[in-house]
């Protein structure tokens, strides 16, 4: 199985998502973050489960949609996947954001 490495910025993204949602509902914030985390675990078993990020169009940079969030990840090699960002689907994503 492939190891999944969370970048510092992806961890920060997850914290910001939690804090934003928790302002209204701590319970829903926990549910949302747990859902994202569990879907990320599925990437380790099937790295190509996500689609190629349309804005980037590189085979190794992919995304998995979880609710209204895009989990952007890079297949670094046969043994490692890096979680690059977690973006709300309404936000624009440019190469400079990775």
Task: Explain the meaning of each model-derived region.
Residues 49-77:
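Basic/aromatic recognition patch in beta-strand/loop cores that engages polyanionic ligands
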Residues 66-69, 74-98:
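Enriched for short, Lys/Arg-rich terminal
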Residues 3-60:
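Basic, Lys/Arg-enriched alpha-helical interface segments
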């Amino acid at each position: 199985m492939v190891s999944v490495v969370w970048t510092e910025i992806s961890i920060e993204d997850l914290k910001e998502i939690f804090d934003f949602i928790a302002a209204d509902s701590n319970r829903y914030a926990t549910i949302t973050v747990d859902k994202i985390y569990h879907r990320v675990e599925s990437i380790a078993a099937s790295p190509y489960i996500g689609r190629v990020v349309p804005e980037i169009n590189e085979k190794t940079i992919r995304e998995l949609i979880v609710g209204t969030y895009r989990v952007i990840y890079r297949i670094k090699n046969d043994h490692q996947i890096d979680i690059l960002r977690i973006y709300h689907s309404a936000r624009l994503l440019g190469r400079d954001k990775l």
